[in-house]
Curated annotation (Swiss-Prot):
Main location: cytoplasm
Pfam family, one: RF-1
Lineage: Bacteria, Thermotogati, Thermotogota, Thermotogae, Thermotogales
N5-methylglutamine: modified positions: Q249
Superkingdom of source: Bacteria
Gene (UniProt): prfB
Known function: Peptide chain release factor 2 directs the termination of translation in response to the peptide chain termination codons UGA and UAA.
Protein name: Peptide chain release factor 2
Similarity annotation: Belongs to the prokaryotic/mitochondrial release factor family.
InterPro entries xref list: PCRF, Pep_chain_release_fac_I, Pep_chain_release_fac_I_sf, PrfB
Post-translational modification: Methylated by PrmC. Methylation increases the termination efficiency of RF2.
One of the record's GO cellular component terms: cytoplasm
Keywords linked to the UniProt accession: Cytoplasm, Methylation, Protein biosynthesis
Length: 367
């Protein structure tokens, strides 16, 4: 006999599968897959490396979706047979539980593959963390967040490079930027941008009082050099300085760090990780280009929101997530409502529950 809980799970999975099929058609996916494969067999496509790369990425994504659609359909067929036999066979009832468990993972994977369809979703990601007001307390919080994302990347098998690291005077960081290298790094992390709030008993307060701290996270994609963003030399203020900080093996200590200020926008980018001043300058310019591109996209998004009457002020009062360490333990995302009491796991990089819920939440909002 199948339990009530399992029946409820099956209903939820069937609904999710219907939602998937409402936005993607397997026949159309397979047709598109054939077209892309045909284009990649044409030798002339490789004359344009950018176009060839786009087709290759598209082919991989379509293959994954096609294979996972087949897998989910097959699992539902197996489930239907197992359910019919489960009333008379206890072992088959156990098999139903196993299929449902496998289906949960397969449907979730399929959902994410369909959602991660943005132009830059497959790209690497630059992730910056900035402390809010509050001195050492906020700077320590910013470093805790930085570690959380680095641990998350490690769990995913992604590579991490520290691009910039400015230590706080007592503890924590004044500013930090990392490059997370991995397939769909930007797609996964793009909704992590925003204000993150911490409530805890401060280790820096002798009176052991409760403190609230803020830090902002900003995520942008690593973009190709051929993106059409003009950066005029006369708009740049370029400074060099000695790299310093607790970046350990990641940070170069010679007089080669570069800080670039884009005068028209006030955007400041620093890089200290590369081995030479020239390399640091090139990396900083690459990040600046990505930030200017993001700024342009943000302007267009805001124009649309103003037309739709949806523009909201972005301020320290609009936190996307709270991390409560005292008087109880809870991490809660204020957009999706997802929460957990296991703050230690979250701070050790276990944040997929939040990321996956964000992706579904924003996909539904935009559909």
């Amino acid at each position: 006999m199948i339990s009530f809980e399992t029946k409820t799970k099956i209903e939820e999975l069937e609904k999710k599968y219907k939602d998937v099929l409402s936005v993607v058609n397997e026949d159309e996916i397979n047709k598109e897959l054939e077209e892309v494969e045909k284009k990649l067999t044409d030798p002339s496509v490789w004359d344009d490396q950018k176009k060839a790369r786009e087709y290759t990425q598209k082919l991989k994504r379509l293959k994954n979706i096609s294979e996972d659609l087949k897998r989910v359909r097959s699992l539902f067929e197996d489930l239907e047979v197992a359910i019919e036999l489960s009333d008379e066979d206890q072992e088959m009832a156990q098999h139903v539980e196993e299929i449902v468990q496998e289906l949960e993972g397969a449907v979730k994977k399929l959902e994410l593959e369909i959602i991660l369809n943005g132009k830059y979703d497959p790209n690497n990601a630059y992730l910056s963390v900035h402390p809010g007001a509050g001195g050492t307390e906020s700077q320590d919080w910013a470093q805790m967040l930085l570690r959380m994302y680095m641990r998350w990347a490690e769990r995913k098998g992604f590579d991490v490079e520290i691009v910039e690291f400015q230590p706080g005077e007592e503890a924590g960081i004044k500013d930090a930027t990392i490059l997370i290298k991995g397939e769909y790094a930007y797609g996964y992390l793009k909704h992590e941008s925003g204000v993150h709030r911490l409530v805890r008993i401060s280790p820096f307060d002798a009176a052991r009082r409760r403190h609230t701290s803020f830090a902002s996270v900003n995520v942008i994609p690593e973009i190709d050099d051929d993106v059409d963003i003009e950066i005029r030399p006369e708009d740049l203020k370029i400074e060099t300085f000695r790299a310093s900080g607790h970046g350990g093996q990641y940070v170069n200590k010679t007089e080669s760090a570069v800080r670039i200020t884009h005068l028209p926008t006030g955007i400041v980018v620093s890089c200290q990780n590369e081995r030479s001043q020239h390399q640091n300058k090139q990396t900083a310019l690459k990040i600046l280009k990505a930030k200017l591109y993001q700024l342009e996209m943000e302007k267009k998004r805001r124009e649309i929101q103003e037309i739709q009457g949806e523009l909201k002020d972005i301020s320290w009062g609009n936190q996307i997530r709270s991390y409560i360490f005292h008087p109880y333990t809870m991490v809660k995302d204020h957009r999706t409502g997802v929460e957990t009491a296991n703050v230690d796991a979250v701070m050790d990089g276990d944040i997929d529950m939040f990321i996956e819920a964000e992706l579904v939440y924003f996909a539904r909002r935009s559909s």
